[in-house]
A protein has these predicted regions:
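Cleavable N-terminal export/targeting peptides
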Residues: 1-42, 58
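Transmembrane beta-barrel strands of outer-membrane/channel proteins
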Residues: 43-51, 103-107, 152-156, 178, ...
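Short glycine/proline- and aromatic-enriched beta-strand/turn motifs that initiate or cap beta-hairpins
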Residues: 31-84, 112
Length: 283
């Protein structure tokens, strides 16, 4: 059995993410904007295909359907309400500019030992058992700058979780970084998000741990990671507004695992990437 708990193991990645976030924010022009509602209600639906690892750290890649739903309702007195899939529900409270606070309700789909893909099912995690899905609750605080937005958001499972014959308690994680949107032309927009993720011990165990029961059923060694920095992630997206109501979007996501996540027996690749392509219709 391997157990790790190093509270200082995420210090240097955090400094990196803060420095990179500030550099990216200062590099973008002042007219970059993140709010796509334009003060009016909107509904966007779309779908396409996504390709990526089966889970963070996996060397097995597969194609998955990509679905996108987003409804935005700005109000004068109550802030802005957003419902999106797969992100969840968001309420941006009013009257705090240039700072902001948003209440969040999300969803963690868990992880199956047999993962469904467009090609069928992958049995790489057979014997690990299923991690049940759960609702997430949390909040985000952010600082809107002329050329981007710095944010910190935290989410926690709404119930205790069980995995591999053990009770994990409530899983929780914290993300901190910067998001920007840069209009390259009247029809082309470049979006970027750079952030680091910290997980509590329960969340790390759910994602990268191996219990004694799981070790007995699989080829993976027992492993109990500690809480700490989990990964650093960069997302880049390009949206082409083909018609006033029609758009195409594509992008990539790349991550680097750090700390105990790198050393998990479930981790085959410490750096991973994925891509997506969607067609969107906006009402």
């Amino acid at each position: 059995m391997t157990t790790k708990d190093n509270p200082n193991s995420f210090r240097h990645p955090v400094m990196f993410i803060i420095g990179a976030a500030l550099a990216l924010t200062l590099a973008l022009p002042a007219h970059a904007a993140l709010d796509d509602s334009n003060g009016t209600p909107s509904v966007t639906v779309g779908g396409g295909i996504a390709v990526g690892p089966l889970y963070e750290g996996s060397s097995h890649y597969a194609a998955f359907p990509s679905l996108k739903l987003k409804a935005v309702l700005p109000t004068e007195d109550w802030g802005t309400f957003t419902a999106a899939f797969p992100e969840g529900l968001r309420w941006d409270l009013p009257g705090l500019a240039p700072f902001g606070v948003a209440l969040l309700i999300g969803y963690d789909q868990g992880r199956k030992e047999r993962i469904h893909t467009l090609d069928g099912r992958d049995d790489y995690l057979k014997g690990m058992g299923n991690l049940d899905s759960t609702a997430l609750v949390g909040a985000e605080v952010y600082w809107v700058l002329p050329n981007g937005r710095l944010f910190v958001r935290g989410l926690q499972s709404s119930q205790n979780r069980n995995y591999g014959g053990e009770s994990l308690g409530r899983t929780a994680y914290l993300e901190a970084g910067v998001a920007t949107a840069y209009p390259l032309s009247s029809t082309l927009t470049l979006d970027s998000t750079l952030y680091g993720t910290w997980s509590n011990e329960n969340d790390m165990m759910a994602r990268f741990g191996v219990t004694a029961q799981q070790a007995a059923r699989t080829r993976f060694d027992e492993y109990h990671p500690g809480g700490g920095m989990r990964d650093v992630t960069l997302k880049l997206g390009l949206t082409w507004q083909w018609q006033p109501q029609l758009a195409l979007e594509g992008g990539i996501k790349t991550y680097a695992l750090v700390s105990d996540a790198r050393d998990s027996p479930l981790t085959d690749e410490k750096v991973g990437a994925g891509a997506y392509l969607n067609a969107l219709y906006r009402f």
